Amino acid sequence: MKKVLALILALAMLLTLTACGGKEEETITFVLDWPPNTNHTGIYVALQKGWFEEAGLKVDVVQPPEGGSALLVASGKAQFAVTAQDSIAPALTGENAMPLTTVAAILQHNTSGIVSPAGEGMDTPKGLEGHRYATWDSPVEKATIRQVMAADGGDFDKVELIPSTVTDEVSALKSGDVDAIWIFYGWAGIACEVAGLPIDYFDFADFDPVLDFYTPIIVSNNDWLASNPETAKAFLAALSRGYEYAAENPKEAADILMEAAPELKSNAELVYRSQEYLAGEYIADAARWGEIDPDRWGGYFTWLNDNGLMETPLDPGMGFTNEYLP
């Protein structure tokens, strides 16, 4: 009899422990847009701190496929991806529109612009006249350069376009093969500083506020969001904690990033200085991390429409939501 009672008690304890274990962790696939860098620090912080695990989530971070990060999300093979407002705009309209919604902005402002060797007269857009610009031949890219040059009294048609996909801005500028390159200052601009390369630089948004579009951003799949709203909120709450930590603790956050991506350790000074720079950009003047201003978002889409850059016009209010942010 005692043995039977002991067996019953053991089974009861096992069932209690199983129940206390809660439901199984949900797996989230998060697709980067580039190899790990300081734009991605928040997700690695949230992973290292166990904040996703606390939320009942198992998060797998993966590299983007050749077709781009958003494609995996649109096809339902991933739940979230990093991309940019200008990149997803064409994917949101037309017969083959992708079911994507932007759920957070990683940075509050567009930190991209044009870099050139110091003292060559390209510290403003008009100065690009008569110089060689490295282009990847995108209509939106060229319209952006044309816009800032016009705002500065310059003529885009006087720029020599050199087809070139630059991956090492420092080497490209040192080689003299091109004079000007579109960069994101938080990484490539800092890389020039670390290399001791004297440069001139201007931000697009300083010459036309409509070009202060959101980049990078985080997108999700419309159908998945509709079916999993609480999971989306839990994921973004944990991710927000990661970026808030990175904003307040740049050195510690940089260390976490380099532990997750050891290949970055050979450029530790770049990582630390980039992280310090972006610490002020993750939240900046917004009320919270991830917030998207409808007017600024819609203003950029209107600009794309007005410049004939979309085959099918965009609704200025489409493609984003703040409802899943904490």
Feature names for model-found ranges:
Residues 26-165, 172-175, 179-186, 202, ...:
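Short, glycine-/small- and polar/acidic-enriched structural segments
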Residues 297-326:
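Conserved C-terminal helix/tail region of periplasmic/extracytoplasmic solute-binding proteins
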Residues 87, 168-171, 175-261:
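Pocket-lining segment of extracytoplasmic ligand-binding domains
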Residues 100-102, 161, 246-257, 316:
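Surface-exposed patches in mature extracellular/periplasmic domains of secreted proteins
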